[in-house]
Amino acid sequence: MNGPRQSDGGIVPKKSPNKPQGAEGMEGRLPVKGNEQERPSLRTQSRDEGKQATLERIREAVKRNKEAKLTSLYHHVYNVEHLKAGYFGLKKKAAPGVDGETWAHYGEKLEANLADLAGRLARGAYRAQPVRRKYIPKPDGRQRPLGIPALEDKIVQSVAAHILSVIWEEEFLGFSYGFRPGRNPHQALNALTVGIEQKRVSWVLDADIRGFFDTISHEWMVKFIEHRIGDRRMVALIQKWLKAGVLEEGQWTWSEAGTPQGGLISPVLANIYLYYTFDLWAHHWRKQKAQGEVIVVRYADDCVPRRLSE
């Protein structure tokens, strides 16, 4: 599946960020019997075989050298089979973006459309489109802004998101539960329940980062991505989505910060950002500064640290 002279093992050493080992198990949870993840159908497994093999090679490259940057990733993004897997992984009835393109209509000429998309990605002619702004009501009566990407942006973001996820899953800490493979809100609640009911808790702090998705620094986001990725084309692709802007009622707005909720790439970018800005700090603080044991449960931008009695 790789092109000639391309290798998933293309890595260069990077300076150690002096962090704890990742790929941690879930923190503070009771053991659960059975498989909590739904098993994909045989049809889905067959379609995803090539993509999964690629992701496994990337995972092994990361494991071989945890202090290195991967320099050969972008060619996986414009692989037609990977793009096809990304297309079939989308929601068929999802609302269209600014392009007005639907899943069904795009699929009428799927092979030709994906070949054209792959060609534009390969030669650098791919352009990210602005997201379409939509609002959904929140329980407190306020409105939550969502950004709906164009269909082709969804496809490419799906492929890129899987690549980023498989890289950083080897680093993410055990108390992070949001938007990660094999993890869900119920597991976060289970960890919280165990901590409160079975531990001697002194206090519980519930923290929500205000406007988190809208205020992510693009400059720092890129710096964090570059901790593990040395492929300039891959980094540039992510920057295109960050800078694509928002279209609302016919008015285009430049994106100076943030990553839109609704984009397929946004959850993994948010987790990467919080890993470097919160998780590593919280882990260091509770190990070096806190008096007594501290358990942390984080689901996306919601966090519940708990201090246990000594």
Task: List where the protein language model places each region.
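Conserved polymerase palm-domain catalytic core
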Residues: 113, 120-135, 139-140, 163, ...
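Conserved phosphate-binding loops in nucleotide/dinucleotide-binding enzymes
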Residues: 145-146, 150
